[in-house]
Amino acid sequence: MTVSIYLAKGRDKALRRRHPWIFSRGIDRIDGKAELGETVEIYANNGEWLARGAFSPQSQIRARVWTFDKNEAIDKDFFVRKLNQAQALRDVLAERDGLTGYRLIAAESDGLPGITIDRYQDYFVCQLLSAGAEATKDLLVEALVECYPDCNIYERSDVSVRKKEGLKQRTGVLHGEEPPESVVIEENGVKISVDIVNGHKTGFYLDQRDSRERACKYVKDKSVLNCFSYTGGFGLYALKGGAKHVINADVSQLALDTAKYNAEINKFDLSKAEFLNADVFKLLREYRDNGTKFDVVIMDPPKFAESKNQLTGACRGYKDINMLAMQILNPGGTLLTYSCSGLMDAGLFQKIVADAALDAHRTVQFIERFEQAADHPLDSAYPEGFYLKGFACRVV
């Protein structure tokens, strides 16, 4: 028997605007008992059919919409269509930017709620973040194999958000071969080694590709401090852009070793690069206290806010770190600063940077805005898909 969800009166407006989430508080009743991730029918309170989605009994997001087409079944062909639609956009980007690594599926923004797929050469790395994504995993793998016959599929569902969906963390091969320690991709003429099994996220921060390329114009003949460098993404582009000297700072020696390897495979001048194992907050204070200055500081920290109750603390963290960055910049220097916290909108982040300038006793001019790369699209009905924001700031 098909399970049916009936929304409370007046709670169908977002769904009619094609927002893909149904919250528990918006449900009037459920007819039938749905299993974790089961496909259910969704109706307005008056019985009008609205959508078909995946049920998640433990999450505040009680259902995520697969389709608004009553005649569309959630089967292998459904996933094949979604993959082909997504690939059409990425083909344009891959040709334009010379990409062999990109985000193929950006979850809700590509019509597949809770499913993220990053492609590194012929390795497809899946993160399944919702009950529906987990329940349809076999169909997804079948669809990937049909669309990409030579693919290798690896799961990196080792993220804490799965607990909210009643799911355990999982990693491992879903199809084909285990990824090697290093898969080298290329973007904008830069080679990057990716560790799919042990790296952050699915191995690399693909969403910052456009920002990395745009950073090049600020660094020629400049001294650059690349904070939270991970495997050196921004630092590599700084060397590409003609920086005089680049310090890559991170707490992970493994990431720094990979950053150095990345510089080597790009044949950059290693005499212009440093790879410093350090706590960035402590390092910035040391530089401030001993008078060390830079022409450019790149500030790309990890997410500071995972939930709303962490937002206040995150604001303090972002303000402190940007204040310290401004204090070690030469007059007229450039701060490239970013936030990947989806709970913090661009307006709030800009205010935080402005407040940091006041505390640093510096004047800041916002001269450029950044956002996530084009393979992380924003669906018009799903504003939550916008999460990465950044600014180029002239600090005087």
Swiss-Prot record:
Subcellular location per the Swiss-Prot or TrEMBL entry: Cytoplasm
Which chemical reaction does it catalyze?
cytidine(1962) in 23S rRNA + S-adenosyl-L-methionine = 5-methylcytidine(1962) in 23S rRNA + S-adenosyl-L-homocysteine + H(+)
Q: Identify the Gene3D superfamilies for this entry.
A: PUA domain, RNA methyltransferase domain (HRMD) like, Vaccinia Virus protein VP39
- Where is it mainly found? cytoplasm
Cross-referenced InterPro entries: PUA (IPR002478), PUA-like_sf (IPR015947), PUA_sf (IPR036974), RLMI (IPR023542), RlmI-like_PUA (IPR041532), SAM-dep_methyl-trfase (IPR019614), SAM-dependent_MTases_sf (IPR029063)
Q: What is its EC number?
A: 2.1.1.191
Q: What GO MF annotations does this protein's record show?
A: RNA binding; rRNA (cytosine) methyltransferase activity
- What is one term from the GO cellular component aspect held by the record? cytoplasm
- Which residues belong to any copy of the PUA domain? 2-81
Give the family this protein belongs to, as stated in its UniProt record: Belongs to the methyltransferase superfamily. RlmI family.
Chain's role: Specifically methylates the cytosine at position 1962 (m5C1962) of 23S rRNA.
HAMAP family referenced in this protein's UniProt entry, alphabetically: 23SrRNA_methyltr_I
Q: What is this protein called?
A: Ribosomal RNA large subunit methyltransferase I
Q: Which organism is this entry from?
A: Aliivibrio fischeri (strain MJ11)
The encoding gene: rlmI
